[in-house]
């Protein structure tokens, strides 16, 4: 199946990963330190822009103001309720997308006829912005938890399908020949060779899906909810209460960092064969 440039980028990233040596603790420390330097640098520039008047305080709160607001908001039961609703939608939708994406993508990549049949369907649907399905989902399921989870699921699904397909197609032929030499059935080779070899591809797709899922949950809560961080951001921004809105935005960013870091840890821990 011909791959788009985005598919190739994810596939190349995953394909090269199994041959990398285990990351040394010194290198991990190096990345951690410079990552922290980058974050602190951005915060300092943000604070400098706020202090010098480059950023209008009516529209952009300073980091110190956001921090002070966070100290007041985080213990609030109302705000914690918004946080819980968003976390619930995000993790439910992302988990379902991971399971469905792998179960759909691996067989399509493994069987050439399925690949040829579903390639144009996947290309067509993936080319449509997932936000375009929002009115349709509202009509089908109404406004509630189910519709929001579906939006998150749909937002995260296709990178996982595409990378699972690439993983199944990228199995080393030498491994398959060894399996056949031991008279392994197609199903046995799928379970013992294709599935483990596809894990780096799947994790690469999961990293992409995390960002898309966060966007999906925020957009869903903008239009389809009276709870959640997306609703909270929309409510506070419309009232020009920017500091609380930025607290919620920072929390969403921390969600993304934490989930991507978890995926990276899993790669470093289990995919160094």
What is each residue range found by the language model?
Residues 1-40, 261-273:
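Transmembrane alpha-helical segments of polytopic membrane transport and secretion proteins
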Residues 16-28, 51-96:
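Periplasmic/extracellular loop-to-transmembrane helix junction in inner-membrane transport proteins
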Residues 51, 106, 113-120, 163, ...:
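Membrane-spanning helices that line or support transport/gating and their immediate boundary helices
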Residues 92-122:
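Transmembrane-helix boundary motif in ABC transporter permease subunits
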Residues 120, 160-163, 167-205, 229, ...:
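Short cytoplasmic-facing helical segments at TM-TM junctions of multi-pass membrane proteins
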Residues 123-159, 166-167:
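Generic hydrophobic transmembrane alpha-helix motif, especially the helices
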Residues 150, 154, 186-220, 246-247, ...:
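Transmembrane alpha-helices
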Residues 230-265:
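Hydrophobic alpha-helical transmembrane segments of polytopic membrane proteins
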């Amino acid at each position: 199946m011909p791959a788009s440039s985005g598919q190739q980028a994810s596939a190349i990233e995953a394909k090269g990963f199994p041959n990398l040596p285990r990351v040394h603790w010194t290198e991990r420390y190096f990345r951690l330190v410079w990552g922290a330097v980058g974050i602190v640098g951005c915060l300092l520039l943000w604070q400098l822009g706020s202090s010098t008047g480059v950023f209008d305080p009516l529209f952009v709160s300073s980091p110190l103001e956001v921090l002070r607001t966070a100290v007041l908001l985080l213990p609030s039961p109302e705000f914690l309720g918004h946080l819980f609703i968003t976390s619930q939608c995000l993790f439910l939708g992302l988990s379902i997308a991971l399971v469905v994406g792998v179960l759909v993508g691996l067989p399509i990549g493994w069987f050439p006829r399925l690949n040829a049949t579903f390639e144009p369907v996947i290309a067509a649907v993936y080319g449509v912005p997932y936000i375009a399905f929002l009115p349709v989902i509202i009509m089908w399921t109404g406004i509630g938890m189910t519709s929001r989870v579906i939006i998150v699921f749909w937002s995260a699904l296709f990178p996982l399908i595409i990378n699972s397909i690439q993983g199944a197609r990228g199995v080393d032929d030498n491994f398959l020949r060894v399996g056949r030499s031991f008279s392994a059935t197609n199903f046995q080779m799928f379970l013992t060779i294709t599935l483990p070899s596809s894990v780096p591809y799947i994790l690469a797709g999961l990293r992409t899906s995390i960002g898309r899922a966060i966007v999906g949950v925020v957009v869903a809560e903008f239009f389809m909810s009276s709870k959640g961080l997306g609703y909270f951001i929309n409510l506070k921004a419309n009232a020009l209460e920017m500091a609380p809105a930025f607290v919620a935005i920072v929390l969403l960013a921390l969600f993304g960092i934490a989930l991507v870091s978890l995926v990276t840890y899993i790669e470093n821990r289990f995919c160094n064969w």
